[in-house]
């Protein structure tokens, strides 16, 4: 049994610990499992006498770390009877079995942290540091018994779409440590730029790391071309090997493992632009998929991974594996020859062949392959770990089959989407993920088959629309606080109201440390129209569709447009989607009635190819055969506006009718969507 999974099994037993959220007067995030209030308090009035009962290397590391914190310590009197801070490695049965668990005792005479492993002592210190931040020099006496639910508690950082320097990465590592997160998934390569020095292939950092256009969006708008590092308009960058060693060592000192991601076989436009012989067509800018039929592809990938493994001691190496187009493989003679030789019947199996081959290479070097859930396609390599991002189905499938998984579904864990009213927030990727929804996530619910194979959970920050360090932090915090509690706390004790109060306080603490956070205190919250059922004449009335909704966005199906339920800020919730066609529906009110209003809301999301209608036509009828037009509403909102928008298209007046036809005509963009949520009739 692997250590990560054994921790999950320990957490399931819960050690009879109380649920998260038992104390209302502290701001520790993630909230400890058990907090017992004791009489009195400990006053820090002078440097605390530090003693560390641990092997020399661990003792030196913990002492060195403490010297970088605001806690005053004195190493001259380790046996002091008061005003002490004692760190003890112990196998006492009262200490949680997890190497990351700890017991923190704050008493008037001093403070003791006991744990089975160095990581547990470190996390006990993180709790103490947060208590010190909140209470200052007088910390209430208490006994905390704590341990994590999951062993994998991660943050993914995309530095390809927009590059962030090593100091930014180290700053986020410090926050991760405070939140007891322990895995940084470093997305180092993608079509937007290569970010790691590889000595054997210098063009990766001389050209593939650079582009014209200060941001990902400007680069895309300019044709998505790369340039040499010495081009006057060059923008981008990469990490030298020395910088990577520095980051990895710094992370290790904070008990964080850095997992590198090298994308393959897709998302590799930047590689194929400078080494086009590795593509199926042999030409630059001809696609983003490596040629799997070419042995030179595997020579390149193995050489790159060899240098990567020299820099990263992580057990896991992430190879991407997502969103390969696979189109060129169908026509490529080399790929087709490979399929014939290997007895492969589909391009999915060809991708699986590539993943298996790379997995075997990593295994020879004592490493394990981890990849996005597309690595399930065509058959999963025996020892591979699945990172489930396209919802939860991939993770559930893998876990049920006995494969280890990390849950990171976009609907709960993708922090590149809007966290508040999209009409007022800075531009982001499509989607709406507020703090409360992040907090609500359970990566391994009780009814999930194979839940013991869920290693943990991860937040993902993709950076297409995040050009600056300040914006990256704005998108991370406080949502990463919620993810930290999802990863650490047992689900039965979670309480969003209590957490939000902690998050409000911790947001202020984060700002005092120099982090740029979202203003949680000023949060707008969910779209007001979605909070209460709408009351109007058409509620519950049958709707006839001349054009049917798209199966990917059905909302409530035939009832969606008259169920009284309005859409949220997210077009994925209660909005009905129509792809490449009109919205042409007729509502039957049951009998002729006086009407004074007909309207419907539409939303526009430029990044998701969702548009407001070009115009709306509204007609009424007494018998359902003869209709008279009562309104034509033209759209005056620009198609090029990139900020999400919500607009009402309707009519007011005085009419008598039983049938109301609402006809929305899309603009001329091929492949565009229309999204509406309710036909309001009064």
Regions found by a protein language model. Give the residues of each.
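Active-site neighborhood of glycoside hydrolase catalytic domains
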Residues: 271, 280-281, 285-382, 389-396
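Feature activates predominantly on carbohydrate-active enzymes
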Residues: 95-316, 332, 357, 361, ...
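Bacterial N-terminal signal peptides
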Residues: 9-18
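Flexible, acidic glycine-rich loops studded with aromatic residues
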Residues: 369-374, 379-384, 390-533
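Aromatic, loop-rich ligand-recognition surfaces of beta-strand-rich domains
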Residues: 566-631, 643-682
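Predominantly extracellular/luminal regions of secreted and cell-surface proteins
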Residues: 532-566
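Contiguous, structured surface segment used for ligand recognition
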Residues: 20-152, 471, 483, 487-513
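Bacterial N-terminal signal peptides that target proteins for export
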Residues: 1-9
């Amino acid at each position: 049994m692997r250590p990560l999974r054994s921790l999950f099994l320990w957490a399931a037993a819960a050690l009879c610990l109380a649920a998260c959220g038992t104390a209302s007067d502290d701001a520790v995030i993630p909230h400890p499992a058990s907090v017992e209030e004791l009489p009195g308090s400990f006053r820090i009035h002078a440097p605390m006498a530090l003693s560390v009962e641990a092997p020399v290397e661990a003792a030196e590391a913990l002492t060195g770390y403490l010297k970088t914190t605001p806690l005053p310590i004195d190493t001259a009197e380790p046996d002091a009877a008061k005003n002490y801070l004692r760190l003890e490695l112990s196998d006492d049965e009262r200490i949680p079995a997890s190497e990351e668990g700890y017991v923190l005792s704050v008493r008037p005479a001093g403070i003791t942290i006991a744990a089975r492993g160095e990581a547990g002592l470190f996390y006990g210190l993180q709790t103490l540091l947060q208590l010190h931040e909140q209470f200052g020099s007088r910390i209430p006496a208490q006994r905390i018994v704590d341990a994590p639910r999951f062993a994998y508690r991660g943050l993914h950082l995309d530095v390809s779409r927009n590059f962030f320097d090593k100091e930014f990465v180290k700053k986020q590592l410090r926050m991760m440590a405070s939140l007891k997160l322990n895995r940084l998934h470093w997305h180092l390569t993608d079509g937007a730029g290569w970010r790691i020095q590889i000595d054997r292939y210098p063009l990766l950092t001389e050209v593939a790391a650079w582009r014209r256009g200060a941001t990902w969006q400007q680069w895309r708008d300019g044709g998505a071309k790369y340039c040499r590092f010495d081009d006057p308009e060059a923008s981008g960058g990469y990490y030298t090997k020395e910088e990577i060693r520095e980051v990895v060592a710094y992370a290790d000192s904070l008990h964080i493992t850095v997992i590198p991601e090298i994308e393959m076989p897709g998302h590799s436009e930047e590689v194929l632009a400078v080494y086009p012989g590795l593509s199926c067509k042999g030409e630059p800018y001809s696609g983003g998929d490596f040629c799997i039929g070419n042995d030179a592809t595997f020579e390149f990938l193995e050489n790159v991974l060899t240098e990567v493994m020299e820099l990263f001691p992580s057990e896991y190496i992430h190879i991407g594996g997502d969103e390969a187009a696979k189109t060129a493989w169908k026509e490529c003679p080399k790929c087709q020859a490979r399929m014939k030789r290997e007895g492969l019947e589909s391009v999915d199996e060809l991708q699986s062949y590539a993943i298996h081959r790379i997995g075997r290479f990593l295994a020879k070097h004592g490493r394990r392959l981890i990849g996005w859930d597309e690595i399930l396609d065509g058959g999963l390599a025996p020892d591979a770990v699945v990172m489930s991002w396209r919802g939860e189905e991939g993770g559930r499938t893998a876990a049920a089959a006995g494969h280890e998984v990390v849950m990171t579904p976009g609907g709960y864990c993708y922090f590149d989407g809007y966290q508040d009213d999209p009409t007022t927030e800075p531009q982001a990727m499509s989607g709406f993920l507020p703090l409360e929804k992040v907090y609500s996530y359970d990566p391994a619910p009780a009814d999930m088959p194979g839940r013991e194979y869920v290693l943990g959970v991860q937040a993902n920050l993709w950076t297409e629309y995040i050009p600056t360090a300040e914006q990256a932090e704005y998108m991370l915090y406080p949502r990463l606080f919620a993810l930290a509690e999802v990863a650490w706390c047992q689900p039965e004790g979670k309480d969003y109201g209590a957490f939000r109060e902690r998050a409000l306080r911790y947001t202020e603490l984060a700002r005092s440390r120099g982090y740029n956070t979202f203003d949680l205190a000023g949060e707008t919250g969910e779209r007001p129209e979605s909070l209460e059922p709408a009351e109007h004449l058409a509620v519950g009335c049958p709707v006839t569709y001349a054009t049917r909704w798209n199966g990917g966005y059905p909302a409530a199906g035939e009832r969606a447009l008259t169920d009284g339920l309005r859409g949220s800020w997210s077009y994925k919730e209660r909005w009905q989607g129509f792809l490449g066609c009109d919205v042409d529906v007729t509502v039957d009110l049951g009998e002729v009635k006086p009407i004074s209003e007909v309207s419907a809301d539409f939303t526009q999301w430029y990044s998701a190819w969702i548009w407001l209608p070009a115009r709306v036509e509204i007609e009424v009828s007494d018998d359902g055969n003869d209709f008279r037009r009562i309104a034509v509403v033209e759209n005056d909102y620009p198609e090029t506006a990139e900020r999400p928008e919500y607009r009402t298209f309707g009519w007011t007046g005085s009419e008598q009718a039983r049938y109301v036809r609402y006809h929305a005509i899309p603009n001329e963009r091929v492949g565009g969507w229309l999204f509406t949520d309710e036909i309001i009739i009064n």
